[in-house]
Amino acid sequence: MHLAVVGLSHRTAPVEVRERLSIPEHHLETSLQSLRSHEQVLETSILSTCNRLEIYSLLRHPEDGVEAIRDFLANHSGLADPDLQPHLFALHHEEAIQHLLRVSAGLDSLVLGEGQILSQVKKMYRLGQDHKSIGPILNRLLNQAVSTGKRVRSETNLGSGAVSISSAAVELAQLKVGQEQGVDDLVSLSQEKVAVVGAGRMARLLLQHLQSKGARSITVVNRTVAKAEVLAKDFPDLVITCCGLDQLDAQLASNTLLFTSTGADEPIIDRQRLDAITRQARLMLVDIGVPRNISSDAADVSGTLSYDVDDLQEVVERNVAARQQLAQQAEVLLDEDRQAFLDWWDGLEAVPTINRMRQQFEEIRKQELLKALSRMGSDFSQREKQVVEALTKGLINKILHGPTTALRAPQPRQQRLDSMAAAQRLFDLPGDDADRDRSDAK
């Protein structure tokens, strides 16, 4: 068995590549089933966000398993090898474990310490359980990742403050508006006519940050107007107007700052649409959707400034230095949790020996109990038989508790192997070829 992660992120691929590999939630079940159907993939889970697509898997064989996942990504994206493979990374065993813990803690995010990624890791975990694509190994690892993400945020200040893709998008708008005014700093958005396209989680975060940065009147554009109206009720201090996507052209014409965050598979704003609209003022577009909601040719339209998630790096670099020390504190916690998982993983090597030991003792218990009860004849009531059976089971558990704990305990691998061999000799346990297979896979 071999643990690996294969994927890409904002660190390895531009948004035009990432959007080709993005997997919508309603397609995740099919994708998980497709991966699990491959003979090399024993367990698998998918993390798909605006900044990364990563597949965590337990594989029969490292090279063949990784190749199977690369083939899946190529087929899913429709990209030719020269356009895809340079952007993919593959990490194995300890590096894969460390990477997932860093991702869950927000240490690998574009916005260092952002909190939304932990929710996305939780969703990956839940979907893996719901669709039965994960087994005991990934179940334990994903559980550890969620715990680590929570621990980092509770034991350090890395997650404090407004750190998310949405907050960075609002800060980018502040920065660009300030630069228009000759100010190299974040300015209030109180003079901007603002619209937000979308009414999901990201749109909610956008409204929160826009409100804190001075915006007071905002239009929410959404395919379902009722959903936009529900969102608007949560912001009583904002003047929010809601409308459908059929009013998008009017909003492009009347607003000066427009954010997009929808789940659309194709751009909803492009040059052709913008060229057909008459505007009297500059229009700034900030797209945090992946796949992108705004076509790259929108920036070619006169009087239009267009930014996507890759442009958020400018804001990130302004804030990263102040958070690096907090990140170093978090790395210490990650090392502890990584070692805890590795200790558990290494302890699995002793499981076959422990199981055979328990099976052998259970057979002896049953045989001796049967002899004793047969000698007692009908003198024992059913209740008394149950008490004696519980007694013998309790004795076996007590006797085996020490050896079981010793075999599972964190220790050098050779020491564990010596202990397993000693248990086999002492209790005359049968051998198991699977033990050697597991040892070879380590």
From Swiss-Prot:
GO MF annotation: an example: glutamyl-tRNA reductase activity
Record field: catalytic activity: (S)-4-amino-5-oxopentanoate + tRNA(Glu) + NADP(+) = L-glutamyl-tRNA(Glu) + NADPH + H(+)
PROSITE patterns: GLUTR (PS00747)
Residues that, per the record, bind NADP(+): G198, A199, G200, R201, M202, A203
Protein name: Glutamyl-tRNA reductase
Stretches with biased composition (Basic and acidic residues): 433-442
Gene giving rise to this polypeptide: hemA
Pfam families: GlutR_dimer, GlutR_N, Shikimate_DH
Segments for region (Disordered): 420-442
Residues carrying the site annotation Important for activity: H99
Coiled-coil regions listed in the entry: none
CDD domains xref list: NAD_bind_Glutamyl_tRNA_reduct
